[in-house]
Swiss-Prot record:
Role this protein plays: Component of the MITRAC (mitochondrial translation regulation assembly intermediate of cytochrome c oxidase complex) complex. Regulates cytochrome c oxidase assembly.
Species per Swiss-Prot/TrEMBL record: Mus musculus (Mouse)
TM regions (residue ranges): 68-86, 280-300
Membrane topology, from the record: Multi-pass membrane protein
PANTHER family, alphabetized: SURFEIT LOCUS PROTEIN (PTHR23427), SURFEIT LOCUS PROTEIN 1 (PTHR23427:SF2)
GO terms of molecular function: cytochrome-c oxidase activity
Domain of life: Eukaryota
Record's protein name: Surfeit locus protein 1
Family: Belongs to the SURF1 family.
């Protein structure tokens, strides 16, 4: 339609070729105006029409983005504060558990219960038994390092020695209960693993023992599988050990006073727990304080953060 109107006002002296060119240009400008919002006038360069509300819309969008970023970044100090508070609760729980274990280990020994199911609630509890060892069926848990019970308690779980060896586990027939249990007699260095090298320490006859009740142990990551065929044990698997020796799946760690001259060194039970929650508390609360300060500078004081 715009092209027809343009032809109507053309001078008559224009050639037909000029009329076609002028009409084509008018048609082209009309299309650009309808599609792209350009305004075209004769003899002028086509320029875009400016929208008065574009600046206001841009400012509103920027304000909305800043508001979202402000509340999103506030999640960082809030989360850090929550994790720090959680670590406070975890530390209280760990201290309570450590105190409970210490009181349990220091308690007076009780007779070994006849019902094995009762042992599930007696881990780390001292028990006393009477009977004799069967040294022909020794098992070896390795590698292990020796622990001095006195230094172990004083130094919160640090190893007393770096010498590698094994724990000697021996079937023990309880004469009063009529059952055979497994007793971890203690540590021997690698050169003394062979029982022929420590015949003096192979206790014979009936003896009274005090030991700490231990439950079965799950294999930890990177720990090899047990090898019963080679008599190499890397973790405490009571069911498998009981099957090999013919004993019941009851396990105790003999205390230090059970040590015989030339035999395994008893008292190798570690009852301390790692308590590093204070480090985590300082880390999370420190992160909360730092990110809260940065958030305040950025969104409250509007100070540019380099």
């Amino acid at each position: 339609m715009a092209a027809v109107m343009a032809l109507a006002v053309l001078p008559r002296r224009m050639t037909r070729w000029s009329q076609w060119a002028y009409a084509g240009r008018a048609q082209f400008c009309a299309v650009r105006r309808s599609v792209f919002g350009f305004s075209v006038r004769s003899g002028m360069v086509c320029r875009p029409r400016r929208c008065c509300s574009s600046t206001a819309e841009t400012a509103a969008a920027k304000a909305e983005d800043d508001s979202f970023l402000q509340w999103f970044l506030l999640l960082i100090p809030a989360t850090a504060f929550g994790l720090g508070t959680w670590q406070v609760q975890r530390r209280k729980w760990k201290l309570k558990l450590i105190a409970e274990l210490e009181s349990r280990v220091m308690a007076e020994p009780i007779p070994l219960p006849a019902d094995p199911m009762e042992l599930k609630n007696l881990e780390y509890r001292p028990v006393k038994v009477r009977g004799h060892f069967d040294h022909s069926k020794e098992l070896y848990i390795m590698p292990r390092t020796m622990v001095d019970p006195v230094r172990e308690a004083r130094d919160a779980g640090r190893l007393s020695s770096t010498e590698s060896g094994a724990h000697v586990v021996t079937p023990f027939h309880c004469s009063d209960l009529g059952v055979t249990i497994l007793v971890n007699r203690g540590f021997v260095p690698r050169k003394k693993v062979n029982p022929e090298t420590r015949q003096k320490g192979q206790v014979l006859g009936e003896v009274d023992l005090v030991g700490i009740v231990r439950l079965t142990e799950n294999r930890k990551p990177f720990v090899p599988e047990n090898s019963p065929e080679r008599n190499h044990w890397y973790y405490r698997d009571l069911e498998a050990m009981a099957k090999i020796t013919g004993a019941d799946p009851i396990f105790i760690d003999a205390d230090f006073h059970s040590t015989a001259p030339g035999g395994p060194i008893g008292g190798q039970t570690r009852v301390t727990l790692r308590n590093e929650h204070m480090q985590y508390i300082l880390t999370w609360y420190g992160l909360c304080a730092a990110t809260s300060y940065l958030w305040f500078q950025k969104f409250v004081r509007r100070t540019p953060i380099m």
